[in-house]
């Protein structure tokens, strides 16, 4: 439609996904371009040109957006190659014109925390890491993240940014499927090469005047992330990294970072030291729980529930390396859990590989409820908490397009909304440390769950409440998380790492994902506004439901 508005004579568009193709035809008609734009309901690589083809003649301008986080991961090379071979005249204009992938070697112990499990220390080493894991290069997949949100003091560039791959989309140079580049460059600083930051940019025009840039020093509002490739220790080569230690396959990078969180580990260790004695017999119900080894090091006998095969293999390595095979028994199935008479303490971080939003880790509560409530437990309480926020960018993933560049796209909004209402959960998981937001209210409790008592499967919980809005702004979301109370003094949170102050930016835990409710209708709020909410919990199946509504008081 932009091309039609600029005066193009003939325009052919293609869309293979039937619901979107149908919607596109409707939008083209509603904006008055049905006589100028022909939509072909197939992939561009399936289109043919000729008398009985999809196009009567070749085009002289190509406009396409087939890029992803790694630039060419969505079939960009084959798409452009086919277009030049079949759909375009020679010397056609291609938008974008060129693409460049950049890389920069950096030193960062924070980034390294996402890649390799480190020993747990408390003055001395409590849990050592197997050499296989220490030497492993990690997963082959890059780690997508918003590098603009990584604090500048947490990494040191060791080399200048380098263009490693250049792609000429214009057709003047061939696009190769297999390409390898070796670069020789001088370091700008001494240090340990922990990782490679990678990003890309696009030259949109033939004169290289219009640049679409994804550069990590500039906060990006686009839906692309920069990404990280982590370097194998003390090895310089061009081989594809492959995990051979099980840990990188079993656990996400977020979980690996969580296992390396020193502050978090110290709180657990302090709480466990007060609770565990050499006579303790503990059941640990958490996937990939290194703290189970800490409990064993404190002298207790441990039953460790590990239902996931990959996680179980990883934990077996840790148990063997730390010489704890005589104190830790790994249990593969819930059916094989020890009898109540065999244990006197149940522990969980809690964390489960299958959990997406934080409260799904309440599976710990359900597992402990198989035992009498007289058996001591940790944590003792779970508090689901929330705060009203103004996101800087995250709300755009749910925001309607409305009118964009002068075109009415409301039909697309309706299609997406109907689909979203059928398939999307009103609360989704997001790593909020990557998405800036300011607090519009104080943090508030939704529900406190006493984990020392067994689940009452017959009790339906429904709670309502209101909280005041304490700062003016645009309330476009609610952030939700869980605080786990370990004992009367110590707790760990999967939410903010600092006290929430209304009107100030919230600092979130970088090693967990929080729950987010994004409003479909965004409200401008003042200190006269309130947030009303309701929460429903069905213990029979573990289902929870959140509802939020902004009330504006004149």
Sequence positions of predicted segments:
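Class I SAM-binding transferase module
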Residues: 1-554
């Amino acid at each position: 439609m932009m091309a039609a508005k600029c005066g193009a004579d003939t325009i052919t568009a293609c869309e293979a996904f039937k619901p979107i193709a149908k919607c596109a035809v409707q939008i083209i008609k509603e904006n008055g371009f049905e006589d100028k734009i022909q939509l072909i309901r197939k992939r561009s690589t399936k289109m043919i040109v000729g008398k009985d083809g999809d196009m009567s003649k070749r085009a002289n301008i190509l406009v396409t957006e087939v890029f992803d986080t790694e630039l060419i991961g969505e079939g960009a090379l084959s798409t452009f190659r086919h277009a030049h071979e079949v759909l375009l005249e020679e010397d056609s204009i291609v938008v974008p014109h060129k693409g460049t992938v950049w890389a920069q070697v950096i030193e960062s112990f924070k980034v390294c925390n996402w890649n390799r499990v480190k020993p747990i220390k408390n003055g001395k080493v409590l849990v050592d890491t197997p050499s296989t894991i220490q030497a492993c290069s990690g997963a082959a997949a890059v780690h997508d993240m918003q590098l603009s949100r990584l604090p500048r003091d947490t990494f040191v560039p060791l080399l200048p940014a380098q263009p490693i791959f250049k792609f000429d989309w214009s057709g003047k140079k061939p696009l190769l499927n297999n390409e390898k580049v070796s670069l020789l460059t001088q370091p700008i600083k001494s240090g340990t090469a922990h990782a490679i930051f990678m990003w890309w940019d696009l030259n949109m025009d033939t004169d290289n005047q219009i640049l679409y840039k994804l550069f990590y020093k500039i906060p990006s509002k686009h839906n692309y992330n920069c990404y990280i490739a982590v370097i194998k220790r003390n090895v310089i080569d061009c081989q594809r990294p492959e995990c051979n230690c099980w840990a990188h396959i079993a656990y996400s990078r977020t979980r690996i970072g969580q296992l390396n969180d020193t502050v978090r580990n110290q709180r657990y260790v302090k709480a466990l030291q007060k609770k565990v004695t050499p006579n303790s017999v503990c059941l640990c119900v958490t996937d990939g729980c290194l703290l189970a080894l800490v409990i064993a090091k404190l002298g207790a006998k441990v039953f460790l529930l590990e239902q996931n095969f990959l996680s179980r293999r990883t934990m077996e390595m840790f148990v063997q390396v730390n010489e704890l095979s005589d104190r830790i028994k790994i249990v593969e199935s819930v059916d094989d859990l020890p009898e109540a008479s065999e244990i006197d303490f149940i522990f969980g971080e809690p964390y489960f590989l299958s959990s997406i939003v934080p409260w799904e880790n309440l599976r710990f509560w359900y597992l402990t409820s198989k035992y009498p409530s007289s058996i001591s437990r940790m944590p003792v309480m779970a508090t689901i908490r929330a705060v009203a926020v103004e996101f800087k960018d995250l709300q755009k993933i749910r925001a309607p397009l409305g009118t964009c560049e002068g075109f009415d796209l409301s039909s697309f909004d309706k299609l997406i909304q109907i689909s979203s209402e059928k398939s999307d959960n009103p609360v989704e998981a997001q790593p909020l440390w990557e998405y800036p937001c300011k607090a519009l209210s104080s943090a508030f409790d939704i529900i406190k769950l006493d984990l020392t008592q067994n689940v009452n499967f017959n009790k339906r919980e429904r709670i309502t409440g209101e909280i005041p809005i304490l700062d003016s702004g645009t309330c476009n979301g609610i952030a939700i998380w869980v605080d786990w109370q370990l004992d009367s003094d110590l707790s760990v949170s999967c939410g903010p790492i600092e006290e929430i102050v209304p009107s100030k930016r919230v600092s979130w835990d970088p090693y967990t994902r929080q729950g987010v409710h994004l409003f479909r209708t965004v409200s401008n709020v003042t200190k006269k506004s309130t947030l009303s909410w309701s929460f429903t919990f069905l213990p029979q199946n573990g289902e929870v439901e959140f509802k939020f509504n902004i009330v504006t008081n004149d």
